[in-house]
Regions:
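N-terminal first transmembrane alpha-helix
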Residues: 1-107, 198-205, 221
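Transmembrane alpha-helical segments and their cytosolic interface motifs
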Residues: 10-27, 148-202
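Charged, low-complexity, helix-prone segments enriched in Lys/Glu/Asp/Gln
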Residues: 72, 102, 109-113, 161-177, ...
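Charge-rich cytosolic interhelical loops and cytosolic tails of multi-pass membrane proteins
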Residues: 80-158
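Alpha-helical oligomerization segments
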Residues: 193-233
């Protein structure tokens, strides 16, 4: 398969590991919840009786996966991050760890980052922070600089460690978004199954798995953000 075509369909490494993987897990959890309902429909349809049907089936799976990737990415960035780090994401670790009151990084290391920001972007961040009494304004000043750092890093050849940390953070965030979507859809499936008299085994098991996955990802999400922020600097 042509590399450019492969990337256009499945995305780069970040897209595959941080977005495609959560989307695939979400779809599998939803399909499992639909087990009894799908079985009732599919036993009357020979989906794989020809190459045409197989092609249509494969294309449908691809379309559903791409749509789910977009939904998860959008929901996670606009909802999960804002719920965790505030509306303007001013509590994100890349900002919080540069505050004078933060103990995540040593003062010496923070000063090195501030001096590098002054050298690279001609912004005296140390003075700007010292002159601000309102912490929200301080966070906004730091946010502007960290955005510049992030853009600079994205243009450079990223190290393997940075990419791994970035993927891990993105995957945790998107898994939370994906499992939340799965839970909502599974609840609808459970209600429908109860009304129609289908077995509730598959919906209940899938909801349990999704809830456990959601809780676990929430547990490691903030730590993944801190590790990503440290690697960015």
């Amino acid at each position: 398969m042509n590399k450019d075509f492969y990337i256009s369909i499945f995305g780069d490494r970040y897209d595959r590991e941080a977005v495609l993987f959560p989307a695939s897990v979400t779809i599998l959890l939803i399909v499992f919840a639909l087990g009894n309902i799908l079985h009732g429909y599919l036993e009357h349809i020979d989906v794989l009786d020809s190459k045409v049907h197989m092609t249509i089936f494969a294309v449908l799976i691809l379309i559903i996966t791409k749509i789910m990737m977009w939904i998860i990415r959008t929901l996670s960035k606009n909802s999960i991050e804002r719920l965790t780090y505030g509306k303007e994401k001013l509590n994100f670790p890349t900002i919080s760890m540069l505050l004078p009151s933060s103990s995540i990084l040593s003062n010496e290391y923070k000063n090195r980052i501030l001096l590098k920001a002054q050298k690279d972007f001609e912004i005296d961040l140390n003075t700007s922070i010292s002159n601000q009494e309102d912490e929200t304004k301080v966070r906004k000043v730091i946010a502007e600089v960290t955005n510049l750092i992030r853009k600079k890093v994205s243009r450079l050849e990223r190290t393997e460690t940075y990419l791994i940390k970035n993927i891990r953070y993105g995957r945790c965030r998107n898994m939370i978004g994906g499992s939340t979507i799965a839970i909502l859809i599974q609840l609808v499936i459970t209600i429908y199954s109860a009304i129609k008299g289908y077995s509730l085994f598959c919906p209940i098991i899938s909801i349990t798995i999704s809830c456990m996955l959601d809780l676990y990802m929430f547990y490691i999400y903030k730590q993944a953000g801190i590790e990503y922020a440290k690697e960015l600097f």
